[in-house]
């Protein structure tokens, strides 16, 4: 069976219904132009993703998460993936600064949901409902993904706020299971989200690597401590 390898993860088939999702220590930014390896990053992303998936499942969000298979490995359900990234934004940061005349750090009065077509060749362009329809994705499917994404946002924002963390923005991916249900997939980690310390606005995510803001592992470990209440490795 074929192993699928991306920039930060490997998908290793277990059987017809499940994959091992292995998180790598690689970090990339700017469409792979900037690259590095950080020992322990894969473990942190796997454990953080597992924590968030468990939290969401407890709140009724269906995910592809089945269990933890090892330090940097999760067992996940095999899905027919949509070629989309669904991005939810609560605070102005990143590429949103280029599209709205608002300063970085501006708290949006309500979340913004954006759609991006997953394509390395096209650099993941932003699309709308009309583009999605051309790609064979129905408005009903898009609306369901947006509905789930906004519920995820509410759950994570509340959980993180109690731990002194601002959920700035994040991206989600979705797939369809064998019963035709739309299920939350991929990962939820500091690779795919922006997390800021509520007091200092210090980044606790991959922006530390993108913009040389400090030690990536220290930032990820701090996030891990706050969301789990444990020290990494304990």
Curated annotation (Swiss-Prot):
CDD domains recorded: SAICAR_synt_PurC
Gene Ontology molecular function: ATP binding; phosphoribosylaminoimidazolesuccinocarboxamide synthase activity
Origin: domain of life: Archaea
Single GO biological process annotation from the record: cobalamin biosynthetic process
InterPro entries, A to Z: SAICAR_synt/ADE2_N, SAICAR_synt_PurC, SAICAR_synth, SAICAR_synthetase, SAICAR_synthetase_CS
Keywords: ATP-binding, Ligase, Nucleotide-binding, Purine biosynthesis
Keyword Nucleotide-binding: yes
Enzyme's top EC category: ligase
One Pfam family matching this protein: SAICAR_synt
Database matches in PROSITE patterns: SAICAR_SYNTHETASE_1, SAICAR_SYNTHETASE_2
Enzyme Commission identifier(s): 6.3.2.6
Gene3D superfamilies: ATP-grasp fold, B domain (3.30.470.20), Phosphorylase Kinase, domain 1 (3.30.200.20)
The protein's annotated pathway: Purine metabolism; IMP biosynthesis via de novo pathway; 5-amino-1-(5-phospho-D-ribosyl)imidazole-4-carboxamide from 5-amino-1-(5-phospho-D-ribosyl)imidazole-4-carboxylate: step 1/2
Catalytic activity: 5-amino-1-(5-phospho-D-ribosyl)imidazole-4-carboxylate + L-aspartate + ATP = (2S)-2-[5-amino-1-(5-phospho-beta-D-ribosyl)imidazole-4-carboxamido]succinate + ADP + phosphate + 2 H(+)
Similarity field: Belongs to the SAICAR synthetase family.
UniProt protein name: Phosphoribosylaminoimidazole-succinocarboxamide synthase
Organism of provenance: Pyrococcus abyssi (strain GE5 / Orsay)
Gene: purC
